[in-house]
């Protein structure tokens, strides 16, 4: 040993570490440290058997689980590759392995990796990233804390399977392959993403890779290259090729098991997985108080050298590496009781390994030595090859840590070549405790590589380094849950809650908080859960996960942001009994502050503050209240300070300025208490004099109002919109009454004496005198005065006199503070200034307003929640122990190369033709392939109005390729003798993930050859998309193009601008199709472009005319259109649909020039053109003549069925439990109206009435007034609501309607449903017509009426209310109508109470809710899925069918569909005789089936029976019924009449019931109801139709639950047919007849119960209906439409503040113009906004009441205020609406004439009157709609 080492050995660990670093910097090493112990402090792993971490791995080992399984089908076909003969070509001798699930899943977003890069990354790299992160979390080392540190990464990798997979798809290889698959990138990426500065080394020594990596990591630590090391390895089996090769060696077990050391050993079975360990020097780990799992005492590596073969093991080398490791570890072999062997289970390898083990660890048997067990984890999970070493290492670490040796599987007797009799070695066949030993437990791990590299590691039990538990448990714990997004925070909270309820139930809460706060990464988003105990913590975490508010939960959006804190001290009014009691008991800093203040308090005030708080009695009298409040405020300030929260400025409100002065240092506590005591004592003399009132008026309005009351003065400037007045009680009450008439808030403020008023004047001289000797100091913290405008007041006697007398300038002070400060904390026992603060500060979210206590909530929990919101968690200051929390939950997505089998097939065949079959007759040919976007992802870059569409160029290439292939041209050769004529796209082909395509080449009898291209519908029908004629011509190749001698000159157009223009017309060309690199527009009406095939477009030798090239050439025709003549609009686009001829002369290559000519620029329905493609040599490569571009409307673009079908599904959504007193008390304070049916003539009604009565008794409280009425008594309802709305102290908050079922008979239910709907419209009229404040929320309550599960019949009467809910969401969104279905078998009112208490929380609300037991379900609109595999025939040949509403447009479409499908008899019901047009249709159908018309109203008795009887006449087999009868009469709920409701209700709902009853004895295949999208999506003006449709929906559910066939389709509007065309608007496009028939076929075949079918306009839904953002039902739609529905960059009303009046008016006008254009369906805004003037009434543009409602709702979303619907309908113009909004926003309009609201309304009324007079003179006949 060197002298340096000897001296260094005497140093402390810290000193030795510092010396070692210096030596490393000097270029030398530290020789004694090669033996330094290394601590294992963390483990991450994923192994077969669903092992996701050390706990699950140990459980697998302890249970002796064998994880080997047959090769999963997503890897390869095990049977196809299997052959027991090792010599079989291309086959393997095994079907088995150990596999990790979901190897294609990765959380790329978490690591900031793009999807494109993630696809190119080897999954081994991906899993290594995630497991490395998990290992650091297990170690308690926040990964982000390692950035910039000397942390090393050493990982073993040897497999290249994913590289092989990528090479198979060489056409799609991109730049990311170079960093996605090399092994060096795996470690480099970890170092890069975590910012690690230590060595990053990838190790490939085959099977020993990961153990060698661990050895290198230990060496690096000892040499001080690194301070922390991540070491391990990964192996995934993605390709069969390695297994095939190993089979040729006979290395793999034919039985699929590793029988280590056993006589049955026949080879190994491959496994896969990943393991990572976190290593530190033991001294560092002890210093850092890390949890040490085990210690690496020594390790060694060597090579076999020359042996019997390169892959043959060498016993001597294995013995040497073991000996070296033991020597370096300085331990004897007999101290090792367990060896984790290489143990592959091969006939050759096992005996050789045992020989080396016997020569080292085996000696000593019979000499009292303890035995040594041999194990191999390969018997559990297979041979993990590159990860095998780390798997065994982790097993050894866990074994020594837990003192238990797991059993070895598949061992019965020793391999005959092994003699263990003379050794201490044995194979444990049962798990057993570790043998007793004098020293620490020790184990060893061996790993031997195929190429000869060996590694051996000695592992030892960790020394006792446990951190002592904290001395005392905190009263509360703060759990910080962090994530990169709010969604990740929610999922982390859910996982943690589940863990704390299950595996982690025994973990102390303080340790959980400590681990979260100190040992986890802090991401951009974090939330905090404050809890006293485990149950509270779990409930808080679940609330956080569900997005529900709860006491003690601070979500991601509640944390204060920005610099600058202001402590705000309130005036009188925040006191309450028992304030501060919990804080005295729980918070030492608060108790200390009170105790230190108490002697001063007693001396100045005369009684004990401390005793007052302990007693908890109510403090009475102004002379006691004010001093106690100041004492409380000073103690609360010290509480904040004890956690490091210090104010940067202070503000006091009235008496609160005393506390502010003390905190700022201007007064001492003694002086402050003297001031408040003197002040309050003098005020007590005036007790009972004067009154004060809070007014919802700004200062100017308040001054103007009280000008007539000389004794009333302005006392407080509370906020920009609120003031407080003071004066004689009678005058104050008069002012209150005057304000109340304006529907504004006005109420008394409870005070002993009216301060800040002349009433105070008599005591002011004495106050000045008593405080004359006060000597204030300059404040150390800025005071922002509410008494004077001076920046820093002098807190002398004059100041305190003015403080009591002057008006409180609170909002001015807050406004001034808000310039430089972001967080305002109210210091008081209860928040009383919150509203004033939030009302004053800007609402853009840059300021945070908080409080300190809340009298209705747990004081300690509430304070710590506020503390967390500031960014401080109390438990961050406490100690604790690291616990094994669940790791970060990954948000996995699938990343994988394109399907390999498809790629292999495409490599051999044309990409768009596919498999070829030559027909036996006529020389016809057929090709079949899949052109879906999953198989051909590049085609997804060709979109029309957002939908991937097969380009016409693609069809043209298919025709060319088919003709060339069938006519004998080589697959990769151009065929100049082939001409395509009369090419036509008959119907666009929408592309889905998988889109099968069939191409047919037909030789006609006239020697003509045709190509036809088909897809197949879900109903099995072929749909022809394109046709072409093929001609074989001897035409010679064209040569040089006369105009192609050089680039043309003209007007250059930017390709980016050109593509942007195309996007405006609905054409989107993604990277694969954006091929134009140069565009020059020429004067002769042509354009020359340069085309380069993008890298994203695939290459293939089979292309004759690459679709991307031809598509770009067709784009060039559009580029030839002159400036100003846009080829299309937002609602229509010009698309190529036919070509006269296509000729290809020579190979195009990747680059070509194009000359495009416009031959006809007619702006009508189409344009004509031709193109010439010129190669680089100047030769013509191809020509296309007679190109026709047709104008295609947006609604004509087909969509796949999956994009048109919707469902309303139930989702469990728990509500956060609310402790009493509830936090939502403020949201329920006010007046409530409870309505129920007073008649109890049915059990359901009696139940509802009883529930209503119980609710009234429970809900009444001092803060809630409850009124009642009979729901069916209209006058009583109106009177009750007038009474509810008449109490200004308790404004209306909610209307609760209890709805009961009529009886078990459906006909009674039908009438009850209709009557209930009508009665609820009365409630709406009462609210909308008589109340002008914030609308109360409407609650509809039923008991078990909704069908949540499929087997629940429900009651149609209750379910019909869903239609009303959906419509009111748009007509009156402010009412937030909600249907709650309670479980009457449980405690329904508890659930209802929870709903009402939580109603005010969150930005979204649930509108249809069902409780089942304690489980809460909500309805969500979702995309539906369809499975047509059931495949039963939809229409039976020759059978009979009935269609109600059969003579309507939709009925006749259904009739034709039935006849086309083979129906024998179709009975059509109708109310009138057929028209001539209908007779013509019927006559045509009659030629193919028997058509019978039955006249009558299906809602009338006997008509339905007649329809069924007719269908069954003469032995007809009735197999299906379609109920399509309908009448629509648009009407807003507010104005709907009872007759209107009945006319709509009868055919849809009553008719459905009649058809249900009439078919009771029929054996039907299906009973289909045609319902409306209005009941699924909602539609303003469609309340009656929506409710009737919802009743039909529920009847279908009732039938299914009763075992009867039934289905319903909620149709959106059809084009040209159906009475529901009124629903067409800017949100729903019409369904074509073909689309409707496809849906009808598919949905009946799939046997779905309920499905909505509609073409939802993704680009306009949020524009037309901004209110859906606040409705949780539409969450999925909102997420889909957020980007598409944007109306541009609108900053909200705040964006107008900095504009001058003229600019503000223009901004408002432009925004309203965009809104109106979207609602009314104008694509050209100039229709709405002509140049000048802007006073054309909107009603003259076609505006109706429904549009007016939507314009109002849009204005509310944009500006926060709304124009009245009546104003819009009275003839208002865009100019008028702008003026009204400017007035409401408080912006001065530059046109003074428009500032008066009466002027605006008068002008609109005059226009309306003139139009009405003209209309009466014309007297048109009323329109009648029929069904």
From Swiss-Prot:
Keywords: Fatty acid metabolism, Lipid metabolism, Multifunctional enzyme, NADP, Oxidoreductase, Phosphopantetheine, Phosphoprotein, Transferase. It is an enzyme of class 2 (transferase). Residues 1439-1617 are annotated as: Beta-ketoacyl reductase. The active site is at 207 (for beta-ketoacyl synthase activity), 342 (for beta-ketoacyl synthase activity), 383 (for beta-ketoacyl synthase activity), 654 (for malonyltransferase activity), 942 (proton acceptor), 1111 (proton donor). One of its GO terms (cellular component) is plasma membrane. Pfam families: Acyl_transf_1 (PF00698), KAsynt_C_assoc (PF16197), ketoacyl-synt (PF00109), Ketoacyl-synt_C (PF02801), KR (PF08659), PKS_DH_N (PF21089), PP-binding (PF00550), PS-DH (PF14765). Residues 1050-1198 are annotated as: C-terminal hotdog fold. Residues 910-1076 are annotated as: Dehydratase. One of its GO terms (biological process) is DIM/DIP cell wall layer assembly. One of its GO terms (molecular function) is phosphopantetheine binding. Residues 1706-1785 form the Carrier domain. Binds 1 phosphopantetheine covalently. It catalyses: icosanoyl-[(phenol)carboxyphthiodiolenone synthase] + 2 (S)-methylmalonyl-CoA + 3 malonyl-CoA + 5 NADPH + 10 H(+) = C32-carboxyphthiodiolenone-[(phenol)carboxyphthiodiolenone synthase] + 5 CO2 + 5 NADP(+) + 5 CoA + 2 H2O; docosanoyl-[(phenol)carboxyphthiodiolenone synthase] + 2 (S)-methylmalonyl-CoA + 3 malonyl-CoA + 5 NADPH + 10 H(+) = C34-carboxyphthiodiolenone-[(phenol)carboxyphthiodiolenone synthase] + 5 CO2 + 5 NADP(+) + 5 CoA + 2 H2O; 17-(4-hydroxyphenyl)heptadecanoyl-[(phenol)carboxyphthiodiolenone synthase] + 2 (S)-methylmalonyl-CoA + 3 malonyl-CoA + 5 NADPH + 10 H(+) = C35-(phenol)carboxyphthiodiolenone-[(phenol)carboxyphthiodiolenone synthase] + 5 CO2 + 5 NADP(+) + 5 CoA + 2 H2O; 19-(4-hydroxyphenyl)nonadecanoyl-[(phenol)carboxyphthiodiolenone synthase] + 2 (S)-methylmalonyl-CoA + 3 malonyl-CoA + 5 NADPH + 10 H(+) = C37-(phenol)carboxyphthiodiolenone-[(phenol)carboxyphthiodiolenone synthase] + 5 CO2 + 5 NADP(+) + 5 CoA + 2 H2O. NADP(+) binds at residues 1440-1485. This is Phenolphthiocerol/phthiocerol polyketide synthase subunit C. It comes from Mycobacterium bovis (strain ATCC BAA-935 / AF2122/97).
């Amino acid at each position: 040993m060197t002298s340096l080492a000897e001296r260094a050995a005497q140093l402390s660990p810290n000193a030795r570490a510092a010396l070692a670093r210096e030596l490393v910097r000097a270029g030398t090493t530290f020789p004694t440290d090669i033996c330094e112990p290394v601590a294992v402090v963390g483990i991450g792993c994923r192994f077969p058997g669903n092992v996701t971490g050390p706990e699950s791995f140990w459980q697998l080992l302890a249970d002796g689980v064998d994880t080997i399984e047959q090769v999963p089908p997503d890897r390869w076909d095990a049977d196809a590759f299997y052959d027991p003969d090792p010599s079989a070509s291309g086959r393997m001798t095994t079907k088995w392995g150990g596999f990790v699930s979901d190897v294609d899943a990765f959380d790329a977003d978490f690591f900031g990796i793009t999807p494109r890069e993630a696809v190119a990354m080897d999954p081994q790299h991906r899993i290594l990233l995630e497991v490395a992160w998990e290992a650091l979390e297990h170690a308690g080392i926040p990964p982000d804390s390692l950035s910039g540190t000397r942390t090393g990464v050493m990982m073993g990798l040897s497999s290249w399977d994913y590289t092989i997979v990528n090479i198979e798809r060489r056409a799609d290889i991109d730049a990311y392959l170079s960093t996605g698959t090399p092994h060096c990138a795996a470690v480099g990426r970890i170092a890069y993403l975590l910012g690690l500065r230590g060595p990053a080394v990838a190790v490939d020594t085959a099977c020993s890779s990961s153990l060698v990596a661990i050895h290198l990591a230990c060496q690096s630590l000892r040499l001080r290259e690194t301070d922390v090391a991540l070491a391990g390895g990964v192996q995934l089996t993605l390709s069969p090729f390695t297994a095939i090769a190993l089979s040729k060696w006979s290395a793999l077990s034919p039985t699929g098991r590793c029988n280590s050391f056993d006589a049955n050993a026949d080879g190994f079975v491959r496994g896969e997985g990943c393991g990572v360990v976190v290593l530190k020097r033991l001294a560092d780990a002890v210093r850092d108080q890390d949890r040490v799992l085990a210690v690496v005492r020594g390790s060694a590596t060597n090579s076999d050298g020359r042996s019997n073969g390169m892959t043959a093991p060498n016993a001597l080398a294995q013995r040497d590496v073991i000996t070296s490791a033991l020597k370096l570890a300085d331990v004897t072999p007999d101290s090792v009781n367990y060896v984790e062997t290489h143990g592959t289970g091969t006939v050759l390898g096992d005996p050789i390994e045992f020989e080396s083990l016997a020569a080292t660890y085996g000696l000593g048997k019979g000499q009292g030595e303890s035995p040594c067990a041999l194990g191999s984890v390969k018997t559990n999970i297979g041979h993990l090859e590159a990860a095998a070493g780390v798997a065994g290492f982790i097993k050894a670490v866990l074994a020594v840590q837990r003192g238990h040796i797991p059993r070895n599987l598949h061992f019965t007797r020793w391999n005959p070549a092994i003699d263990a009799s003379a050794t201490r070695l044995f194979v444990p066949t049962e798990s057993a405790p570790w043998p007793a030993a004098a020293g620490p437990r020790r184990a060893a791990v061996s790993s031997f590589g195929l190429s000869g590299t060996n590694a051996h590691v000695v592992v030892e039990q960790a020394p006792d380094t446990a951190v002592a538990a904290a001395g005392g448990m905190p009263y509360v714990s703060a759990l910080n849950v962090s994530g990169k997004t709010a969604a990740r925070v929610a999922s982390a909270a859910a996982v943690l809650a589940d863990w704390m309820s299950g595996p982690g139930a025994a973990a102390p809460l303080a340790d959980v908080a400590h681990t979260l706060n100190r040992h986890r990464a802090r991401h951009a988003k974090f939330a905090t859960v404050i809890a006293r105990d485990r149950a509270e913590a779990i409930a808080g975490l679940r609330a956080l996960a569900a997005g529900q508010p709860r006491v003690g939960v601070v979500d991601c959006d509640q944390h204060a942001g920005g610099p600058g804190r202001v402590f705000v001290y309130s005036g009188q009014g925040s006191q309450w009994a028992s304030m501060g009691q919990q804080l005295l008991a729980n918070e030492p800093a608060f108790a200390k502050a009170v105790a230190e203040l108490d002697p001063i308090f007693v001396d100045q005030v005369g009684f004990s503050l401390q005793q007052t708080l302990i007693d908890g009695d109510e403090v009475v009298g102004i002379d006691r209240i004010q001093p106690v409040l100041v004492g409380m405020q000073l103690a609360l300030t010290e509480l904040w300070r004890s956690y490091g929260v210090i104010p940067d400025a202070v503000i006091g409100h009235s008496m609160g300025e005393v506390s502010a002065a003390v905190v700022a240092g201007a007064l001492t506590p003694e002086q402050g208490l003297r001031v408040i005591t003197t002040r309050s004592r003098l005020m007590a003399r005036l007790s009972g004099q004067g009154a004060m009132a809070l007014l919802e008026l700004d200062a100017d309005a308040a001054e103007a109002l009280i000008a007539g009351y000389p004794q009333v003065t302005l006392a407080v400037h509370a906020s920009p919109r609120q003031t407080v007045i003071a004066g004689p009680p009678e005058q104050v009450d008069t002012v209150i009454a005057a304000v109340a008439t304006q529907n504004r808030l006005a109420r008394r403020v409870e005070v002993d004496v009216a301060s800040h008023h002349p009433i105070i004047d008599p005591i002011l001289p004495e106050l000045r005198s008593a405080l004359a000797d006060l000597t204030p100091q300059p404040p150390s913290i800025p005071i922002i005065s509410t008494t004077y405008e001076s920046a820093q007041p002098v807190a002398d006697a004059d100041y305190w006199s003015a403080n009591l007398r002057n008006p409180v300038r609170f909002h001015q002070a807050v406004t001034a503070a808000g310039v430089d400060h972001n967080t305002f904390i109210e210091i008081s026992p209860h928040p009383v200034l919150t509203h004033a603060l939030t009302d004053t500060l800007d609402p853009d979210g840059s300021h945070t307003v908080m409080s300190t206590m809340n009298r209705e909530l747990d004081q300690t929990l509430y304070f710590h929640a506020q503390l967390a919101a500031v960014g401080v968690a109390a438990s961050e200051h406490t100690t604790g122990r690291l616990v094994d929390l669940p790791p970060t939950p990954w948000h996995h997505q699938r990343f994988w190369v394109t399907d390999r089998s498809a790629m292999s097939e495409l490599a051999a065949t044309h990409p768009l033709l596919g498999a070829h079959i030559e027909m036996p007759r006529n020389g016809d040919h057929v090709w079949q392939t899949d052109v879906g976007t999953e198989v051909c992802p590049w085609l997804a870059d060709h979109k029309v109005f957002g939908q991937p569409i097969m380009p016409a160029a693609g069809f043209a290439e298919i025709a060319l390729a088919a003709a060339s292939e069938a006519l004998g041209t080589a697959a990769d050769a151009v065929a100049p003798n082939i001409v395509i004529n009369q090419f036509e796209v008959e119907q666009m082909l929408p592309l889905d993930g998988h889109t099968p395509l069939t191409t047919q080449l037909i030789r006609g009898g006239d020697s003509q050859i045709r190509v036809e291209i088909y897809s197949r519908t879900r109903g099995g029908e072929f749909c022809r998309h394109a046709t072409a004629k093929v001609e074989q011509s001897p035409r010679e190749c064209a040569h040089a193009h006369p105009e192609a001698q050089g680039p043309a000159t003209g007007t250059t157009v930017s390709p980016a601008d050109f593509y942007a223009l195309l996007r405006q017309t609905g054409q989107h060309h993604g990277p694969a199709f954006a091929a134009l690199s140069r565009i020059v527009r020429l004067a002769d009406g042509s354009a020359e472009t340069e085309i380069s095939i993008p890298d994203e477009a695939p290459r293939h030798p089979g292309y004759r005319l690459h679709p991307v090239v031809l598509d770009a050439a067709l784009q060039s025709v559009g580029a030839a259109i002159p400036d100003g003549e846009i080829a299309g609009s937002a609602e229509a686009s010009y698309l190529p649909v036919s070509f006269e001829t296509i000729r290809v002369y020579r190979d195009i290559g990747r680059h070509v020039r194009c000359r495009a000519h416009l031959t006809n620029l007619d702006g009508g329905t189409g344009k004509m053109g031709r193109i010439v493609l010129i190669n680089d040599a100047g030769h013509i490569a191809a020509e296309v003549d007679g190109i026709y571009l047709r104008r295609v409307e947006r609604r004509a673009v087909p969509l796949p069925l999956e994009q048109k079908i919707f469902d309303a599904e139930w989702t469990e959504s728990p509500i956060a439990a609310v402790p009493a007193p509830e936090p939502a008390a403020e949201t329920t304070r006010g007046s409530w109206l409870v309505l129920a049916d007073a008649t109890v003539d049915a059990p359901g009604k009696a139940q509802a009435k009883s529930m209503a009565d119980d609710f009234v008794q429970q809900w009444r409280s001092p803060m809630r007034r409850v009124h009642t009425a009979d729901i069916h008594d209209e006058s009583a309802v109106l009177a009750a609501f007038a009474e509810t709305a008449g109490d200004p102290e308790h404004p209306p908050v909610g209307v609760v309607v209890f709805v009961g079922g009529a009886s078990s008979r459906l006909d009674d239910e039908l009438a009850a449903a209709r009557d209930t709907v009508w009665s609820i419209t009365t409630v709406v009229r009462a609210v909308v017509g008589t109340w002008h404040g914030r609308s109360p929320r409407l609650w509809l309550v039923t008991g078990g009426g909704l069908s949540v599960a499929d087997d629940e019949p429900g009651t149609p009467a209750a379910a019909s209310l869903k239609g009303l809910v959906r419509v009111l969401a748009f007509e009156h969104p402010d009412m937030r109508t909600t249907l709650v279905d309670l479980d009457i078998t449980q405690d329904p009112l508890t659930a209802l109470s929870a709903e009402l208490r939580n109603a005010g929380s969150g930005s979204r609300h649930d509108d249809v809710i069902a409780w089942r037991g304690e489980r809460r379900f909500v309805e969500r609109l979702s995309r539906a899925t369809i499975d047509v595999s059931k495949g039963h025939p939809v229409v039976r040949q020759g059978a009979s069918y009935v269609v109600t509403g059969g003579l309507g447009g939709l009925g006749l479409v259904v009739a034709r569909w039935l006849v086309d499908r083979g129906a024998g008899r179709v009975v059509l019901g109708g109310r009138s005789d057929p028209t001539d047009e209908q007779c013509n249709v019927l006559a045509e159908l009659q030629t193919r089936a028997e058509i019978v018309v039955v006249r009558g109203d299906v809602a009338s008795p006997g008509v339905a029976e007649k329809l069924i009887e007719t269908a069954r006449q003469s032995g007809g087999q009735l197999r299906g019924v379609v109920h399509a009868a309908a009448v629509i009469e648009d009407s807003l709920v507010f104005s709907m009449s009872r007759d209107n409701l009945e006319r709509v209700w009868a055919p849809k709902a009553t008719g459905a019931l009649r058809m249900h009853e009439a078919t009771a004895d029929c054996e039907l295949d299906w009973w289909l109801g045609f319902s409306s999208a209005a009941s699924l999506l909602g539609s303003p003006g469609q309340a009656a139709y929506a409710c009737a449709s919802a009743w039909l929906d529920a009847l279908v559910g009732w039938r299914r639950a009763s075992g009867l066939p039934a289905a319903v389709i909620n149709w959106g509007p059809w084009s040209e047919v159906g009475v529901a065309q009124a629903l067409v608007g800017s949100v729903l496009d019409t369904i074509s007849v073909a689309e409707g028939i496809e849906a009808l076929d598919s949905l009946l075949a799939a046997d779905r119960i309920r499905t909505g079918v509609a073409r939802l306009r993704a680009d306009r839904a949020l524009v037309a209906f901004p209110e859906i953002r606040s409705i949780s039902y539409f969450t999925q739609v909102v997420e889909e439409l957020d980007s598409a529905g944007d109306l541009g960059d609108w900053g909200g009303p705040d964006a107008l503040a900095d504009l001058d009046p003229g600019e503000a008016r223009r901004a408002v006008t432009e925004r309203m113009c965009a809104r109106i254009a979207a609602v009314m369906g104008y694509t050209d805004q100039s229709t709405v906004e002509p140049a000048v003037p802007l006073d054309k009434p909107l009603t003259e543009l076609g505006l109706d009441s429904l549009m007016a409602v939507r314009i109002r709702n849009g204005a509310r979303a944009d500006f926060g205020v709304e124009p009245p619907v009546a104003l819009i309908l009275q003839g208002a113009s865009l100019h008028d609406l702008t003026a009204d909004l400017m007035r409401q926003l408080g912006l001065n309009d530059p046109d003074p004439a428009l500032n008066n609201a009466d002027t605006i309304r008068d002008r609109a009324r005059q226009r309306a009157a003139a139009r009405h007079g003209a209309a009466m003179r014309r007297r048109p006949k009323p329109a009648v709609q029929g069904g």
